Amino acid sequence: YYVTSQVTNVLLLLDQYTPFKEALYNSFVKHLPINYKVDLLFHQYNERLFNTIIRESVGKYNKYIVMNFDNEKFSMVLNKIHPTKLLLLDFGKFEKEKYSYICQDFDEAFYQALLMLKEKLRHYPQLVLLFSKNLKHPQSSKEYFTRFCEEQGFLCEIQEDIENLTVRKGVVYIAIKQQDVVKVVKQGRLEGLKCGRDFGLLAYNDIPSYEVIDEGITSLSIDWEMMGNEAANFVLNNVPVQKFLPTEVRLRKSL
């Protein structure tokens, strides 16, 4: 009984599995003592599942670390959790002043990252953002992409049909999904084009394999390990945190 009473139960509710979410998770649990028990669940962007998980978890955990279902709208079911016990991760373009959060900015920070790459991008006259209809990424990123292209004089296109993608010379492709990065590289090879010379490729969210794929894929990303570390600090120290992590550019040979 004594040992059980010392266990701190934590719910870590993420949206879906990706290699960078795994980096977040590994960093999170690495910074917690052995008597902290973490239940890792995924809501898969299913609102009904998200609501069910939250409702059924109320009162069972000491801390709730949650990726909200939507970037634009706070999920009302989270009102069932006391604000001091809840930490919001990643999505956060909504009113959240009474809550702790560690989020990323999909708008202005995305725009500023493109500005940092402006001179590299100028080797290519056109930018194409790969944004399929079912992509669970904030729609507002499209507006900031278009704004950057218009202000900097790039031809721009937002391509929804990734299945029938044709890689063209003189184009930089911005890929959000890991599968789309692979698709662009493979399709470029089929067309006889070299990444980083004939066309460019920029990935959203860095993963270790981007260091070695096709001599290196340039990425823009928050530090997911830092997010995990800071989430662990929230759990351990009971200190409120409200911050947006910086979006960093990792320049490699694909641009």
Language model features with spans:
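Flexible loop/turn connectors
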Residues: V167-V172, Q179-L255
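Short, solvent-exposed amphipathic alpha-helices that sit
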Residues: P19-I34, A109-M116, K136-F154, K183, ...
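Short, conserved loop/helix-junction motifs that constitute active-site signature segments
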Residues: L78-P83, L121, E191-G196
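Short, well-ordered beta-strand segments
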Residues: V10-L13, V128, L202
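Short beta-strand elements in bilobed, periplasmic/extracellular small-molecule ligand-binding domains
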Residues: L32-Q44, Q126-L130, K142-V167, V171-V172
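An alpha-beta-alpha
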Residues: Y111-Q152, K243-L255
